[in-house]
Amino acid sequence: MEGLLAYGLFCERLPNILSSINFFDYCIKKAPTCDKETSYIRYDAMRNINVPRCIEIPNPVSYYSLCMSISNNWKGFQDYFYRQTYGHVYKISRIHIRKLMKRKEVFKMNYEDWHVDGTPELDLQIGAKFLVEADISSCFPSMYSHAISWAVIGKEKAKVNRNGNEWYDKLDVCTRRIKHGE
């Protein structure tokens, strides 16, 4: 959980004066709770082309609840992703969560070691007609949270089974609490 909470609350584009390491320490000692819907904290950052970019930071206590949900249900995530990727040749991407060597962060948006990691696009392109590129930097705030459970067990089954006791339902609830209950 430390990688998500202490190093994952603020995106890399924010000035490095912002840190959630002390907030992580506070959460470990106090375990704050937030059972209500919260809003993002907005921050306008200037892009290198002199155009502002709106960056929204989740309410820290709601984000802590989301991190706790992920941490407490990690086995469910592991089992799901194992089933989904078993037998796949390409399992590593530059943005998926993975342990970085000698770092506490869980993920980094652009890995510096592309020489070591390799660039699988060329291998994936062989025999393909198209290469799709996507900027997911603004995906999370606009993501439909129910899509999480739909992706895990299927839309129809998720709609029937709404008891909220499964790990993916808990993740859905915590995700909605971060952005106005949406």
Where are each of the predicted segments found?
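Conserved two-metal-ion catalytic palm core of "right-hand" nucleic acid polymerases
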Residues: 1-181
